[in-house]
């Protein structure tokens, strides 16, 4: 008991030290006027998918995303461990308006949202309400949502979320339960919809009333780079670049490329400061070379201009 108490005390002490000595995100400063200009003609970050052809496969896109999307607020534990717990500054709706189209949602059996053991002052019902309100206003967009069982429980997680998912069923991309093709949908298939990536104990897609909701997170039709546990910046950046190049050469798999990482001595904010601008410049270089389809780039603390430059890598009408 004393040992556990001592460990918790040391972690809290480290967090206080990091809180006072961690500097804000570095990098370039962008004016609001710069990032808020249309991407092309009248295309804005709120509706950027609307300017892409219906036939475009999701695997052929460059999609900005966020890691631990809801970790911009939380309870007292979140506040005390903020340097390690915080991964975002924008609210969910602000992220969607800024162009984020992949979100990382982690819930427990009580259907509240957590980052590990830390409650983020949010619920799954609130998340779904926010997403559907956005899709009502922007019906040609789609949101890819990883939904992780943060409790790693048994089948009860799927059982508990079914009534809530059923309320919003018209907003989810579904296929017949018997469909085993695992094909990546086109924009026409998913406009105005949520593509659910389920990460649960059963390791199977969510099924309600003989309809399959989205697909399993980590299924064979996906490639995931998520070296998050204390990599060097050099190693992490190399992995990001390699995964993006792989994505640009494949059109039958979703590439989930995490820019995020953390350790006890290097916080998510510090990794973001070291990596986000490097990744942005890399994307800009590939755009100028007409190398497209870089997959889903999943970030902590993304700047709005970084999000926009990832979007601009896509081939618009």
Curated annotation (Swiss-Prot):
According to UniProt, the name of this protein is: 1-phosphatidylinositol phosphodiesterase
Q: Name one GO molecular function term.
A: phosphoric diester hydrolase activity
The record's section on PANTHER family has: PTHR13593, SI:DKEY-266F7.9 (PTHR13593:SF113)
Q: Does the keyword Lipid metabolism apply?
A: yes
| UniProt keyword list | Cytoplasm, Lipid degradation, Lipid metabolism, Lyase, Secreted, Signal, Virulence
Superkingdom, taxonomy of origin: Bacteria
Q: State the InterPro entries in the record.
A: PI-PLC_domain, PLC-like_Pdiesterase_TIM-brl, PLipase_C_PInositol-sp_X_dom
One GO BP annotation is: lipid catabolic process
Q: Which residue positions does the secretion signal occupy?
A: 1-22
> What does this protein's UniProt record list under function?
Cleaves glycosylphosphatidylinositol (GPI) and phosphatidylinositol (PI) anchors but not PI phosphates. Important factor in pathogenesis, PI-PLC activity is present only in virulent listeria species. It may participate in the lysis of the phagolysosomal membrane.
Assembly description = Monomer.
Where the record annotates domain PI-PLC X-box, the positions are 58-196
Taken from the UniProt entry, a GO cellular component term is: extracellular region
Where found, per UniProt? Secreted; Cytoplasm
Q: What is its EC number?
A: 4.6.1.13
NAD keyword on record: no
Main localization of the protein described in the UniProt heading: secreted
Annotated active site: 67 (proton acceptor), 115 (proton donor)
Q: What class of enzyme is it?
A: lyase
The record's annotation in SMART domains points to: PLCXc
Q: Which reaction does it catalyse?
A: a 1,2-diacyl-sn-glycero-3-phospho-(1D-myo-inositol) = 1D-myo-inositol 1,2-cyclic phosphate + a 1,2-diacyl-sn-glycerol
